[in-house]
Curated annotation (Swiss-Prot):
Recorded GO MF terms: metal ion binding
NCBIfam families: ATCase_reg
Any GO BP: 'de novo' pyrimidine nucleobase biosynthetic process
Species in which this protein is naturally found: Chromobacterium violaceum (strain ATCC 12472 / DSM 30191 / JCM 1249 / CCUG 213 / NBRC 12614 / NCIMB 9131 / NCTC 9757 / MK)
Family to which this protein belongs: Belongs to the PyrI family.
Superkingdom as given in the UniProt entry: Bacteria
Protein keywords: Metal-binding, Pyrimidine biosynthesis, Zinc
UniProt KW Zinc keyword: yes
Name of the protein: Aspartate carbamoyltransferase regulatory chain
Residues holding Zn(2+): C107, C112, C136, C139
InterPro entries attached to this UniProt entry: Asp_carbamoyltransf_reg_N, Asp_carbamoylTrfase_reg, Asp_carbamoyltrfase_reg_C, Asp_carbatrfase_reg_C_sf, Asp_carbatrfase_reg_N_sf
Cofactor: Zn(2+)
Amino acid sequence: MQYTRTVEALKQGTVIDHIPAGEGVKILRLFKLTETGERVTVGLNLVSRHMGSKDLIKVENVALTEEQANELALFAPKATVNVIDNFEVVKKHKLTLPDAVEGIFSCPNSNCISHNEPVKSVFYVKTLAHDTKMKCKYCEKVFSRDIVAEVR
């Protein structure tokens, strides 16, 4: 069987691979990856031997930090985030859930002061029995990850 690349190689930037199918567009939107001004290559529902199907994102000339990569773990805990330089992987981020996430999500509680005050949203992240919960720093209400992500 002949092996062919579905997506072109990246000279410099970041590759986010092994994203669960259907989560790629959400990650693009939440992390504003299309607002970098750089070329973004997106593969949706690509064939994967390990996952069945997956999404893939490549962002040229942008190197995600460890903190940014860990924030991705909220949506794709088994994703791989590789920083590329001159077509070579120079850094592999090992994803772990962050303790807190700042400025990415809006609080689902319409009475939360974060909607009316000039403050960045902050959520504390906890995993309980395979369910990720997020607690707002300001109103102290606890929400599931899916509810918080939908509000943004």
